[in-house]
């Protein structure tokens, strides 16, 4: 999602469709993936202004420079050329391409945010990095493909609710070493360890009210990737899986080409096991008479918006 698209008086249909999807969801907390980052926050401001024009308000925003497109200075993919998109910390043609942003109606405790975006992959316990990277790449490559955040929000009661947000690497587009597959697996394992009390810096995570959310990029039942790792995360005793479904009952969250890669479940919201989930779903209309219509949702993204209602 580009700034130029958002400020254009005649925006592309996919931008208008994205706004339609966000308005239809009307979430209190919204994690957007794939939004380009700029240091002054112009793109995010343009997005919130466009939503405000549709009477949807998000007064509290958070975004930081992602790893996508950030130079490493080494030949990560080993093809003998430097400075290409696959040599960046996360795949990207420019730094900030396809970043993340959190939009919230609850105040963000900005000074308490824990940002793990710069954590080195090789520093993860039992990291796969030394097996799949060159020594030079292992010294500099970060674990997060895009970003990894622990963001506390302040509820009206004064209590905090944490959003654990990330966007993992697709476990494809590599070679026989399975570099991206193992990176994806370790990005998921990071959060398993974090929930178990391990921390890359600072105190252990002890919050009771939280949700882990983002694009994990692995389906536990089919497709590429180390499916056993995502299944272990889904089974973690600190989490629950509401298993949001589309109106037709499917769990898949993408509309991809069949048979490969096929429609897969790669997007998740996993609340704390102690929270009361009252409803969940996937915004995937089955007709043109729905609001928004099926074609608009398809134009917005090949991923579908998933949602979970919590009562606590």
Predicted feature locations:
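Active-site catalytic loop in hydrolytic enzyme cores
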Residues: 116-156
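Active-site-proximal segments of metal-dependent phosphoesterases and phosphodiesterases across multiple
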Residues: 168-188
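Metal-dependent phosphoester-hydrolase catalytic domains
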Residues: 107-115, 119, 123, 152-153, ...
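N-terminal, active-site-proximal structural segment of metallo-dependent hydrolase catalytic domains
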Residues: 1-100, 130, 137-140, 156-161, ...
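Extended hydrophobic secondary-structure segments that form protein cores and membrane-embedded regions
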Residues: 61-65, 164, 209-215
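Solvent-exposed loop/turn segments at secondary-structure junctions
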Residues: 1, 35-39, 66-71, 108-109, ...
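Active-site-proximal beta-strand elements of phosphoester/diester hydrolases
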Residues: 1-5, 114-117, 160-170
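Beta-strand-turn-beta hairpins that frame and shape the catalytic cleft
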Residues: 105-110, 139-169, 312
């Amino acid at each position: 999602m580009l700034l130029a698209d958002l400020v254009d008086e005649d925006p592309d249909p996919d931008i208008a469709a994205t706004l339609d999807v966000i308005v239809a969801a009307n979430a209190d907390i919204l994690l957007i993936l794939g939004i380009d980052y700029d240091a002054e926050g112009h793109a995010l401001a343009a997005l919130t202004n466009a939503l405000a024009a549709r009477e949807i308000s998000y007064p509290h925003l958070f975004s930081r420079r992602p790893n996508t497109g950030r130079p490493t200075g080494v030949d990560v993919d080993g093809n003998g050329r430097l400075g290409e998109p696959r040599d960046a910390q996360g795949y990207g043609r420019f730094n900030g391409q396809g970043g993340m942003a959190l939009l919230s109606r609850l105040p963000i405790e900005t000074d308490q945010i824990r940002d793990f975006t710069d954590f080195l992959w090789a520093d993860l316990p039992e990291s796969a990095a030394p097996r799949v990277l060159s020594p030079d790449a292992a010294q500099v490559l970060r674990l997060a493909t895009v970003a990894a955040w622990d963001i506390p929000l302040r509820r009206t009661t004064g209590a905090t609710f944490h959003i654990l947000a990330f966007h993992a690497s697709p476990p494809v587009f590599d070679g026989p070493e399975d570099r991206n597959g193992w990176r994806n697996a370790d990005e998921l394992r990071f959060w398993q360890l974090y929930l178990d009390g391990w921390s890359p810096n600072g105190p252990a995570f002890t919050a009771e009210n939280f949700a882990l959310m983002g694009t994990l990029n692995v389906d536990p039942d089919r497709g590429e990737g180390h499916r056993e790792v995502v299944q272990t995360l889904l089974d973690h005793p600190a989490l629950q899986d509401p298993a949001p479904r589309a109106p037709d009952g499917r769990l898949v969250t993408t509309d991809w080409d069949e048979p490969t890669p096929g429609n897969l479940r790669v997007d998740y919201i996993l609340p704390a096991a102690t929270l009361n989930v009252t409803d969940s779903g996937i915004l995937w209309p089955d007709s043109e008479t729905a609001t928004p219509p099926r074609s608009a949702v398809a134009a917005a993204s090949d991923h579908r918006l998933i949602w979970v209602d919590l009562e606590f």
